[in-house]
Amino acid sequence: MPLLVTSASGANGDGFGALLSFELDGTLRGTFIDDDRIVDPRGLAVDPRENLLFLNSGADRVLAISSQGRIVRDTGRIEGLNPGGGIFGPDGRYFVGLRSERTIGALPTSFDAALEHVLPPRVVPFPRGFAFGQDGRLFLASGIGPDGQGDNTILAFTPAASIEPSRLVADPELSPLDLAIAPNGNIVVSSERPFGAVDAVMSVREYDAMDGHLVRVFSPNGRAEFCKPRGLRFGPGGLLCCVAHNEVVGFDFESGECLGAIARLPRLNGQALVFFP
């Protein structure tokens, strides 16, 4: 099961602008798919029902890719999409972070219907990661945008009141970049505080999903560079992975121990990662 990583380019980082594939021992396989529709790739998610990889392209489109590395569906260019992260929701649709509109949209996996706003436009100053909790609530990390504007919190939206979120997390040491739900139902967030600062503190932080209190902090403890942490993903055997500037860093979620870099590549500028197929 290879590890796939989106490597940013352009304004998002001086990376390779490609979807890269690594062996589980960290060996670089190369580019998973070479297609000019993949530009400054961002969010990734696997649809287990069809075993397809969904990729958010900086070319304002979403692509569905087979395990053989072929594009099998393409939304075509959606004006102003500017997608960020992507996940599958409880209803089976593909949810996309909309950076310019500061909200979240959803698409059917068949791409046969228009993008639908799930939350109102500009619901946060700048959306970072988001995920659905085990109780159906939608958690959205609100962070700092490229222009330096924004806030640092996590909001919770209930299905019945998506317009009136609750401010779940108020942590002065948090500046979120991505968000995922842990096997125990808690929220884990990658953080760079202050965002963009040369002396920023990098961490992965776990919060209680019910009251938002800080449970624990994962840190590299000298076993990894861990600069510019971005996308989070849980892998096999309780492995928590976080992609960063030059590496993918692994943590044992149960113990909290940093396992070091499980893959390294100078200028990786990783944005998101998945294990696929």
Protein language model features and the residues they cover:
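Short loop/turn segments that connect beta-strands within beta-propeller blades
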Residues: 23-27, 65-70, 108-113, 157-162, ...
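Beta-rich, blade/repeat-based domains predominating
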Residues: 14-16, 35-49, 78-94, 100, ...
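A short beta-strand motif characteristic of beta-propeller blades
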Residues: 27-35, 70-77, 113-121, 163-170, ...
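A short loop-to-beta-strand structural motif that recurs across blades of beta-propeller domains
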Residues: 16-20, 61-64, 102-106, 152-156, ...
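Residue position within the beta-strands of beta-propeller blades
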Residues: 4-7, 54-55, 95-97, 139-141, ...
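Short loop/turn segments immediately following the C-termini of beta-strands
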Residues: 8-10, 57-58, 99-100, 143-145, ...
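Blade-level signature of beta-propeller repeat domains, shared across WD40, Kelch, NHL, RCC1
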Residues: 245-277
